[in-house]
Amino acid sequence: MPTRGYDFASPKIQTVFYDNIIFTILLMQKDSGAPCTDCAVFPRGAIMKRLIGILAALCVLVGCKETKKTIKIGIVQLVEHPALDDAYKGFVDALSEAGYVDGTNISIDYENAQGEQANCVTIAQKLVNDRSDLILAIATPAAQAVANLTKDIPILVTAVTDPESAKLVKSNDVPGTNVSGTSDLTPCAAQIDLLKRLVPNAKTVGMLYCSSEQNSVFQIGLAKAQCDKLGLAYIDATVSSTNEVQQVTQSLVGKVDAIYVPTDNMVSSSIVTVAQVANENRIPTIVGEEGMVERGALATYGIDYYALGKQTAFMALDIIKNGKKPADMPIQYLEHCTLAVNRDTAAKIGISIPDDLK
């Protein structure tokens, strides 16, 4: 929107403004006693040319400069837990480092669904109705809610394990929709290998996850395949709400030698409860990301969600600055993974950490 004053980019406004100035000059000459016929020496076209330089300076003084549009970015996050919080922070920080600051040249509307799918839909509808220029969806359920409501607004996702199996894109290599972003696919096979290293005598693994989270189902499939290779048996322990986490975890006591938790949003938000039950019963818990280790789980080999958020912001900049389309932007992954071990937990449950993992 232009600032207050004349929009000198409009030819019509230019003509009216020039004519008024010319008329004023003629009146001034008349008032000074000079005959108006003298003005014939300066044809209208010549006078207009002489005025262009003056008008250029006047434009600055009267505020005719066009202001840049504020870019509206809507963000919906499924739930609060360290991994998703870090992804959000990385996204915002990377935009700021690139000169796109909330309240200055971009407007960020951040909403948290508090783990409720119904809230995801309500928030997604709000962001679409507000005509956001770009929407960031953090976690698979949030991404699905937004993608179901708009096929026009560019959508970037992060902390989504497999956008293709979540039906957000036609393929991860060539999305072909208004959705792209970054995957938080962790090395599930390597995590099961880590479990076997830390618990060499393990025979049975409890698979603790929410069966309605597509990202978790995908990871559990990979983890089970690796268990099969290593000769490990497994028991599914699924939850449908955070209220069930403690009871379901307790049901594994005496049945399993270790517990595996993927990057499951529902279980992650209740990982303190899981760790408390597991640690009291000296059951090692291998998880999908470092935030869960910090809150009591034993270990992980996973990605940095802050870096994942920053990588998503770089994709957003490509859309904002370079006009790229999500349809043509492949899903991106982090290549580097990090080992994290909670030594206090290890000591509490009697696990010795091999020297090469210290």
Where are these regions (language model features)?
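Short, low-complexity disordered leader/linker segments with a strong preference
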Residues: M1-F8, K12-I71
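Short hydrophobic alpha-helices and adjacent helix-cap/hinge residues
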Residues: I21-I22, R44-G45, K49, C64-K358
